[in-house]
Amino acid sequence: MAIVVNKPLPEFEANATGGIKVSNVSHLGQILILYFYPKDNTPGCTTEAMQFRDKFKDFEKAGAVVFGVSRDNMKSHDDFKAKLELPFELIADTEEKMCHMFGVVKNKIMYGKKVKGIERSTFLVGPDGLLAQEWRGLKVPGHVDEVLKSVKALKSGKKLAPAKEAADKPAKETPVQEAA
């Protein structure tokens, strides 16, 4: 089942650092931010994590809970979290269940070879459990500030405009299809 803005998230459950279990209903009543990134300890992903870290108190003040999601294992996440002193948890989606559910697994060309990669994307879920906004294929600079702005608007009851990155960027990569 695909995720759709203004609809509830499909059922899921995942493990995060700190022994936390995250599901489609675990954070009802709170604003939930799920940001998907390709890999721990890579330049863009490190910058993005530090930007979420640096704005964490602002997100918390606005009633939002932040989770980073990647295919890395729990040990990699624990090390990455400790190294960057991240105040939020990281979800280890080693089997790519969430990545496929959210449609962030894409075919990419690296060094002339076709590989499966994660498209940097963020999903904002309202306190009612409905997907409020999504950003796909985003660029790191300025993104965290845009998410925070949307969180504050959502908290105040304002209608959210479509995300710039999602609306303005044509899809260049195709989703990877799972075998039946």
Please state what every model-predicted region is.
Residues 1-180:
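Chalcogenol-based redox active-site neighborhoods
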